[in-house]
Amino acid sequence: LRPALQGVRASPCPKGWLDFRGNCYGYFRHELPWRKAQAWCRALRDGCHLASIHSAEEHRAIARFVSQCQRGEEEENVWIGLRQLVKLWAWSDGSKMRYSAWDDDEFTKGNYCAALEDSSGFLSWEDDSCGERNAFICKYAA
């Protein structure tokens, strides 16, 4: 080993993915409706879903990652794994909702899904029609 590489651990995540606190996050710029984006994530590997976000720290790391990925492009909203089921919001990976960052408390009734809002630097969420086509972020446990 070269001295500069001692103590450096190889990332368990694929090249170009974010490695954060035991999870891998991949950004996909091709725009899909929410259900197709979720299917894309599920097809990547077992346990992969549209990203669930459970803390402000995790949210900031993802927002920085998405901003870097979209650098030089027109910023666009990005799907995360939250969607409205009847009156409740639920994560696509089945995890409990312990954190939220909605841009406001007014929700439209109907078939809505959550996206990181481009105009906030991806630091707030917006409810968007699930049929809208957005870029998306996938997550799996490393």
Swiss-Prot record:
SMART domains recorded: CLECT
Record-annotated C-type lectin domain positions: 20-139
Key words, A-Z: Disulfide bond, Extracellular matrix, Lectin, Secreted
Covalent S-S links between cysteines: C13-C24, C41-C138, C113-C130
InterPro entries given in the database record: C-type_lectin-like, C-type_lectin-like/link_sf, C-type_lectin/snaclec_domain, C-type_lectin_CS, CTDL_fold
Pfam families, per the entry: Lectin_C (PF00059)
Principal location: secreted
Protein's name according to its UniProt entry: Dromaiocalcin-1
